[in-house]
């Protein structure tokens, strides 16, 4: 695993965070050391796939990055005639994802596409995964995507939505942000790295509250919506059609 040192030295002109070649190269290390509970979420996606994925259906991993969630789901699917479609708009991520998937043998076919998830059709889905992806979409585009997912899911299909959250209570919000930064420092990131990455993400990652997510998912039509995992200001929800 290549170590993430992208923000370890001062950057004079710090632009917006993008999922380019450099990020794709270090992404597994970056997300492991940056997102509390990431491994637990990836493991549980497999457990949820085992329960929810049905025969003759599709599984979508929207914003699949290097394929961790796709592989976890595939390892746990025991139904026939299932296809997994992974989509990411970063060509470097897609290339590494294809290599990663190809390294593991399975009878379940996986197709990895380089595309904008807003432009991809969702159909005959028993499971859709949005693992730390929705937060990077413009807020005005989120309902349309979730509506498309809901309409493309079969009855009793599941959406797994993992996100960084913000909290309405200012003190709690600041506390959880501070704890997250402490988590990153404990994982070897310096103050400079934490600060520069935070600045780079400011304009591209816009977080919602847990309540905002719940209300939006119910308004779209999901019958059951619940937070199943949280660590500091990161977590994951399930929404069942």
Curated annotation (Swiss-Prot):
E.C. number(s) listed in UniProt: 2.1.3.-
Annotated SUPFAM superfamilies: S-adenosyl-L-methionine-dependent methyltransferases
Ranges in coiled-coil conformation: none
Keywords (A to Z) from UniProt: S-adenosyl-L-methionine, Transferase
InterPro entries: CmoA, Methyltransf_25, SAM-dependent_MTases_sf
GO molecular function, one term: S-adenosyl-L-methionine binding
CDD domains attached to this UniProt entry: AdoMet_MTases (cd02440)
Keyword S-adenosyl-L-methionine annotated: yes
GO biological-process terms attached to the record: tRNA wobble uridine modification
Annotated positions binding S-adenosyl-L-methionine: 38, 63-65, 88-89, 116-117, 131, 198
Enzyme class: transferase
Lineage: superkingdom: Bacteria
Reaction(s) catalysed by this chain's protein: prephenate + S-adenosyl-L-methionine = carboxy-S-adenosyl-L-methionine + 3-phenylpyruvate + H2O
Quaternary assembly: Homodimer.
Function: Catalyzes the conversion of S-adenosyl-L-methionine (SAM) to carboxy-S-adenosyl-L-methionine (Cx-SAM).
Family the UniProt entry places it in: Belongs to the class I-like SAM-binding methyltransferase superfamily. Cx-SAM synthase family.
Protein name in UniProt: Carboxy-S-adenosyl-L-methionine synthase
Organism: Haemophilus influenzae (strain ATCC 51907 / DSM 11121 / KW20 / Rd)
Gene (UniProt): cmoA
